[in-house]
Amino acid sequence: LTSGGTINGQAQRQEITASSFISSGGTLRIPSNMWVWSDSTSTAALTIDIPCTIINDGKIIGKGGTGGYGQYPASGYSGVGNGSGQDGGPAIKINSSVSGVTITNSSGAYIAGGGGGGGASSVEPANTYAGGGGGAGGGTGGAGGGVGTGNNGGSGGALNAAGSQYIVPSGVAGINSA
């Protein structure tokens, strides 16, 4: 950070707070080569806690939501999301006690909340369970869940994310045992 309020020398910063870089009434410029991100859907990438001006020439992105878990409804599997993807996180939070904030998003820059995680699916009678993909911003893919399983999902990412897939063979744990 220079005395003028520009973040320099780093390609990315995690979960920043305006008052850590500028004084009240100051201007914080996020340069075009900068990514500001969050690793938590409950924490914004940029928290504004003072009156200020933010000029975004870069990218401010929230954490992507976790993908849902694929499951057969009768299996009793209760993974996170229970088949539904989770919400993504915010890109920017302005504290409720703060007023006098101006945000300018330059051409080519973006401010994006994390994408919601994809929902899961299960197919009967083939017993194929596919977890949903994680949301943009780094959400984790959901697991495919068969009877008695707890498969881990794949890692998410800004470009793509996928969960695991699990196929229950006929006759396992009484499923398709005809």
Name what the model sees in each region.
Residues L1-G114, G118-A178:
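Glycine-centric low-complexity repeats
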